[in-house]
Regions:
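Gram-negative outer-membrane beta-barrel proteins
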Residues: 34-42, 85-91, 122-126, 175-179, ...
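Detector for outer-membrane/organellar transmembrane beta-barrel domains
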Residues: 185-278
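Outer membrane beta-barrel
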Residues: 22-36, 50-174, 187, 196-200
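Short alpha-helical scaffold segments that flank and stabilize functional sites
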Residues: 12-13, 23, 31, 209, ...
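Gram-negative bacterial Sec-dependent N-terminal signal peptides
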Residues: 1-21
Length: 278
């Protein structure tokens, strides 16, 4: 059997002898704390209390590399590699992926940014901005949505900013890496699009996300999500409000739809201390 391949596009960064302006940045976030829990399930009636050290409370602990290469004419090549780590143990967050949070390469210009690889979805990007808790790993309401596609493998993503309006679109050939099945392009597919408008203190966003089943048997089934929300900053405070709709049936049995309504407030007591309620 002869297998034919057509390369539609290829993006990459290569070492050259050209004297183009370039940079590579090593960055990271360290988040560790002490947590007290009550009524933890145990052998004791009514549960027990627990004190423990935790990593990734308000933000996932991580490290990464981010690079930019000036190609001239307003065009630049970019890449990002990011890995989650646990500061309480030093272990990787994902034992099978070194760069579990992102691994992409792309091109950018005044018309926007086009990237290929593992990257965040429009649903994640929009929720991160409109969630009062900032998608905090341990405390955000949205962490209860186990199927929310925060990141997608094998993804093409476009992001452009035009006079305060950010437009983002993503298409993943296989969100979890289990798709790309010959003869069935629907398996594990993920699509999403979002609009975010920011002007002064006001931000308004909307996003739609769709996931196909991850097996051939469930490829025609879909998880659908839509979200709309807004935030407004006044003085040291910032208010949030929003709504998320969900309907899905990618599993063996259809699941019930769900709705989430939220409101919240952040208040900066000092430059280093912020109170959040939601």
């Amino acid at each position: 059997m002869k297998i034919s391949r057509i390369a539609v596009a290829s993006l990459g960064l290569f070492a050259t002898t050209a004297f183009a302006q370039s940079s590579v940045t090593l960055y990271g976030v360290a988040d560790a704390g002490i947590e007290y829990l009550s009524n933890v399930p145990s052998a004791s009636p009514g549960g027990s209390n627990q004190v423990r050290m935790t990593s990734g409370n308000m933000s996932t602990s991580r490290w990464g590399l981010r690079g930019v290469e000036d190609l001239g004419g307003g065009l630049k090549a970019i890449f990002e590699l990011e890995s989650g780590i646990s500061f309480d143990t030093g272990a990787q967050n994902n034992s099978t992926r070194l760069f579990d949070r992102s691994a992409f390469v792309g091109l950018g210009s005044k018309y926007g940014q086009l990237t290929l690889g593992r990257q965040t979805t429009p649903m994640y990007d929009t929720t991160l901005q409109l969630d009062p808790m900032g998608f905090a790993p341990r405390y955000s309401l949205f962490k209860m949505d186990d199927v929310l596609a925060g990141r997608a493998d094998n993804a093409i993503k476009y992001r452009g900013i035009f006079s305060g309006l950010t437009v983002t679109g993503l298409y993943s050939f296989s969100r979890t890496g289990g798709g790309e099945v010959p003869g069935n392009y629907k398996v594990d597919r993920n699509m999403g699009v979002s609009l975010m408008y920011e002007t002064g203190a006001l931000a308004v966003g909307a996003v739609y996300d769709e996931i196909q089943g991850s097996t051939v048997a469930t490829a025609d089934r879909k998880d659908r999500r839509a979200l709309i929300g807004a935030s407004y900053a006044f003085g040291p405070a910032k208010a949030f409000i929003g709504y998320r709709w969900y309907n899905g049936n990618v599993g063996a049995l259809p699941t019930n739809g769900s709705n989430i309504y939220w409101a919240g407030l952040r208040y900066g007591l000092t430059p280093a201390l912020t109170l959040t309620g939601a």
